[in-house]
Amino acid sequence: MGQKVHPFGFRLGYNKNWQSRWYSKKEYPAFVFEDHNIRKFVKKTLYHAGLAKIEIERAGGKVRLILSTARPGIVIGRKGVEIEKLRADLRKKFKREFAIEVNEIRRPEVESQLVAENIALQLERRVAFRRAMKRTVSMARKFGAEGIKVTCSGRLAGAEIARTEWYRDGRVPLQTLRADIDFGFAEARTTYGVIGVKVWIFKGELLDNEVA
């Protein structure tokens, strides 16, 4: 049975960049764990803001967060109130100084993490899984995705036996290194159990060493 390598790990250093950018000899394990906790905290705090990516950079004890979001207004707040509150909460919890940069995602329909979370939300609201998959696939294609593949795994429609269903439209060349493949994963917590949602979106081919 063929196994699939993670599309980001497969392309790291070639046309994908690391989402944590720093180096430390002595504190490496502590920083990795702290990065995980920072992402978890920010994701929980801004769960309604459509966060697709949280990048972390470190320099001289200061942490810089780069948040890619579909709703920058919610993250920043009126006159920057929300972003200041987030910075204060992070400083209090992690005892570090934080700088926060917010980038707007212009086309959330072709951002795989947001697409996966959208499908998961629909499943939690008891929308039929096939309808949720087909709706998001057609929307992604409409907004310029060259190909998209969606899989849902678990007790679909409340079935006794868990299974995996998938739907694909267009090309999704996972083994082509120069292909710009975006990958997202989300979980739908339904009354029957957890349903895993995976989304691969092919956005086109990149030139040699061009970073997506």
Curated annotation (Swiss-Prot):
Entries under SUPFAM superfamilies matching the protein: Prokaryotic type KH domain (KH-domain type II) (SSF54814), Ribosomal protein S3 C-terminal domain (SSF54821)
Record-linked InterPro entries: KH_dom, KH_dom-like_a/b, KH_dom_type_2, KH_sf_prok-type, Ribosomal_S3_C_sf, Ribosomal_uS3_bac-typ, Ribosomal_uS3_C, Ribosomal_uS3_CS
Domain KH type-2: 38-106
GO biological process, one term: translation
Pfam family, one: Ribosomal_S3_C
Annotated keywords: Ribonucleoprotein, Ribosomal protein, RNA-binding, rRNA-binding
MF GO annotations: mRNA binding; rRNA binding; structural constituent of ribosome
Protein's UniProt keywords contain Ribosomal protein: yes
Function comment: Binds the lower part of the 30S subunit head. Binds mRNA in the 70S ribosome, positioning it for translation.
Annotated family: Belongs to the universal ribosomal protein uS3 family.
NCBIfam families registered for this protein in UniProt: rpsC_bact
Name of the protein this chain belongs to: Small ribosomal subunit protein uS3
Native source species: Nitratidesulfovibrio vulgaris (strain ATCC 29579 / DSM 644 / CCUG 34227 / NCIMB 8303 / VKM B-1760 / Hildenborough)
Gene of this entry: rpsC
